[in-house]
Regions:
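RNase H-like, metal-dependent nuclease domains and their acidic two-metal-ion catalytic environment used
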Residues: 1-141, 161, 165, 169, ...
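RNase H-like polynucleotidyl transferase catalytic core
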Residues: 133-157
Length: 248
């Protein structure tokens, strides 16, 4: 790829890695905690970096991020909150085992983003008490506001509309991929259609949104790690000169 080529789609990241040409893999888990007759759901995605060679002027390694949904789970209504940390610990163990085979010399980073509203706060504390060493826990209070905020205790405030809108845009622009054959993919597709009809909130239709919110939380974590995955980056046309420095 030419250094002066106009880049469209997921943006190219010029990346200097201190331990070699392979960026660390990142796994993002989104956990939506259900109340009453709502299911809890867990969605897992991961970021892989597609190698685009090296910049011929700076010798920086060039990568494009690829975000793929790897797992979607809707837990039975009988699943107690006290069982959630055990489920998360098992998923982290599975991720570590899988990643050790895929990139044995590059350990994975894993982040769990939890919907901390309603019953979420005590679950967050249980998760923190049992978290494996390489798991970062990020509690999110989903708000009706208009902007993100940092709250006490490591919590973040994120508007619901922003989460859902970003997720839909990432799917539409190809920034987020999900195999159609994945279990619960069709259920998620139907949730998204329902949300599109009800202005990002299922309250009027009575439909569930647990898979969508879990996917939105995981996608939010991914865009924090790789801003190139955000829809704004996907539509931006930029000519790169120096490392991470646009010419104009």
């Amino acid at each position: 790829m030419s250094q002066n080529q106009i880049i469209e789609g997921p943006a190219v990241r010029l990346f200097n890695h201190p331990n070699g040409p392979v960026p660390a893999p990142k796994w993002n888990l989104g956990l939506d905690l259900g109340e009453r007759q709502d299911h809890s759901a867990l969605v897992i995605n991961d970021i892989e970096w597609q190698s685009l060679g090296r910049c011929y002027t700076t010798y920086a390694y060039k990568f494009a991020p690829i975000l793929t949904v790897r797992s979607m789970e809707r837990f039975p209504l009988s699943t107690g909150y006290q069982n959630i940390p055990l489920i998360i610990a098992e998923r982290v163990r599975q991720i570590n085992e899988h990643q050790s085979k895929r990139t044995p010399h590059v350990p994975a980073k894993i982040e769990l983003v939890v919907d901390a509203g309603g019953p979420g706060t005590p679950v967050v504390e249980m998760l923190r008490a049992m978290a494996p060493e390489n798991l970062t826990i990020t509690p999110v209070m989903i708000t009706s506001g208009t902007g993100e905020s940092r709250l006490k205790g490591g919590y973040h405030g994120v508007p619901r509309r922003d989460l859902v809108t970003r997720l839909i845009q990432m799917i539409a622009t190809g920034c987020l991929q999900c195999p159609a054959s994945m279990p619960n993919a069709l259920t998620w597709h139907n949730e998204l259609l329902s949300l599109s009809r009800t202005n990002t909130h299922p309250g009027e239709s009575g439909e569930h949104d647990d898979l969508t919110m879990a996917a939105a939380l995981a996608a939010w974590a991914a865009t924090r790690e790789a801003p190139e995955l955000s829809p704004a980056a996907a539509t931006k046309k930029t000519k790169y000169g120096f490392i991470d420095k646009p010419i104009f």
